[in-house]
């Protein structure tokens, strides 16, 4: 009789430990091992001089090329065994340029090496490269401006300006016209441009990142871009 009771206690203990591991394991992984997700991209917090921070002056006319410090990435909300987190990937292999004339960005085209975008988890990166974005067949993402960006309300101070951009975005081999808000500012001899865009996966024929029984994600993610442009 005692042996039977001991066996039951042992079984209950095993089940309890398993349940704690099932619930507590993801919590420990997300909050202590993986750590908090990276903050959203933002314009650099640097000291600016009001004498050279106003776009639209003659010194800004011409072609501006993507330089070091430019970043592109994604943010996707995940639920891992009931624990909420945000998957974040970042990359810096960006090329392209923008043409500024007066207070107008008259042309712009940018290209991103999609395979260079990485998170802090190797398994997530493998899913991103193969199952989700298929970087072998679709190695690049591109954006081409189709309407000039008018900066007529540009303030002559160090504060960022706001504008709206429209162009053709190609992701996963699918091209759609998109319109999004952006912020831009002149910092010394450079121009920084910040923007983001909500991407609905099905709209771009992108496989939903969810994995049955393991992780559930939203049906959309945020595309983040921070461009650091230098005068050509």
Task: Give the positions of each predicted feature.
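Low-complexity, acidic/polar, glycine-enriched regions of mature
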Residues: 2-232
């Amino acid at each position: 009789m005692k042996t039977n009771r001991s066996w039951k206690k042992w079984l209950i203990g095993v089940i309890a430990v398993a349940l704690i591991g099932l619930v507590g394991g993801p919590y420990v992984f997300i909050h202590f091992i993986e750590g908090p997700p990276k903050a959203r991209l933002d314009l650099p917090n640097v000291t600016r001089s009001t004498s050279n921070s106003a776009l639209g002056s003659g010194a800004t006319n011409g072609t501006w090329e993507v330089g070091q410090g430019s970043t592109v990435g994604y943010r996707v909300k995940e639920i891992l065994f009931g624990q909420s987190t945000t998957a974040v990937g970042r990359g810096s292999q960006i090329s392209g340029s923008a043409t500024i004339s007066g207070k107008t960005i008259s042309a712009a085209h940018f290209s991103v090496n999609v395979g260079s975008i990485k998170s802090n988890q190797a398994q997530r990166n493998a899913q991103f490269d193969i199952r989700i974005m298929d970087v072998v067949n679709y190695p690049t993402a591109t954006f081409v401006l189709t309407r000039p960006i008018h900066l007529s309300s540009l303030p002559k101070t160090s504060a960022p300006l706001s504008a709206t951009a429209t162009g053709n975005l190609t992701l996963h081999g699918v091209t759609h016209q998109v319109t999004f808000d952006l912020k831009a500012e002149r910092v010394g001899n450079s121009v920084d441009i910040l923007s983001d865009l909500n991407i609905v996966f099905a709209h771009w024929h992108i496989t939903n990142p969810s994995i049955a029984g393991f992780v559930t994600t939203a049906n959309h993610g945020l595309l983040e871009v921070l461009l650091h442009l230098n005068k050509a």
